[in-house]
Amino acid sequence: NPEMVDILCWTLQHGPATVLTNGTVLKEEWLAKLQEAEQQSRYSLEFRLSIDGFSSETNDPIRGDGTFDRAMAGVSLLCEFGFLPIITATRVWDEESDLEVLAQFKTVLKAHGYWRPRIKLLPTLQIGAEENRTRGYLQHEVLTDTMLSDFDQHNLVCSHSRIVTDRGVHVCPILIESPDSNLGQSISESLVPFEIKHGACYTCYQYGSICTNASSGNTLSTTEPTVNPPDTAREDGDT
């Protein structure tokens, strides 16, 4: 959207904003304007930058040729303008390898000027291309009334948010391609109950609000925005 920078500047006058991006097309003039807008606002501007591997060999087969190098350039640019992007990666490796993979992410990010990286790991959603690559949801992978009886449904994004698009207002960003996720043409029309019956709802239930900004609780990442330390800072920034 050619008006996105202006939209974000306006948004910051009224509340916080988060940009979900692959980081490959960021421009200095955009970030300079957004930096100024955030500095003048009482609210924060977050960037969530999707990278699904710590190298071209691991990322590009998923996101496309050349995307890793362009994304890393985007990370460096964001850090240059004082933003601390949440690096978001879908776990396409064995869970037992988390520490090793996070350590490799950290090494690469530090090499691009991001000294205290914030990393958010997402579970694999068995929809879209992933359904063809591995498998779809199994018959038993659905939510039941019993599972929800003592569950705080505020942890589910659909309980308090909606997604506004040029095709209508949807219940959540994950189900945006599902016809039943379109709840109307306005926010008021969309404020109706939604039956959480999709397989993706099961994953969201398992892992909490996977679309929110909290970064990984792993010791290799930090959940609080901090200023990048200079090159002389200690190297063990694991908390």
Give a label for each model feature.
Residues 1-39, 47, 51-58, 66-70, ...:
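Canonical radical SAM enzyme core domain
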Residues 11, 39-41, 79, 113, ...:
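A generic structural signal for short, solvent-exposed coil/turn residues
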Residues 13-17, 41-45, 81-84, 115-117:
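Short, well-ordered coil/turn segments that N-cap beta-strands
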Residues 14, 40-43, 68-74, 108-110, ...:
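Short, surface-exposed linear patches
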Residues 21-22, 50-53, 76-84, 117-121, ...:
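Short C-terminal domain-edge/linker segments immediately following a structured domain
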Residues 50-52, 57-170, 180, 217:
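Radical SAM enzyme [4Fe-4S]-AdoMet core and its adjacent flexible, acidic
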Residues 129-239:
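Accessory C-terminal segments flanking Radical SAM cores
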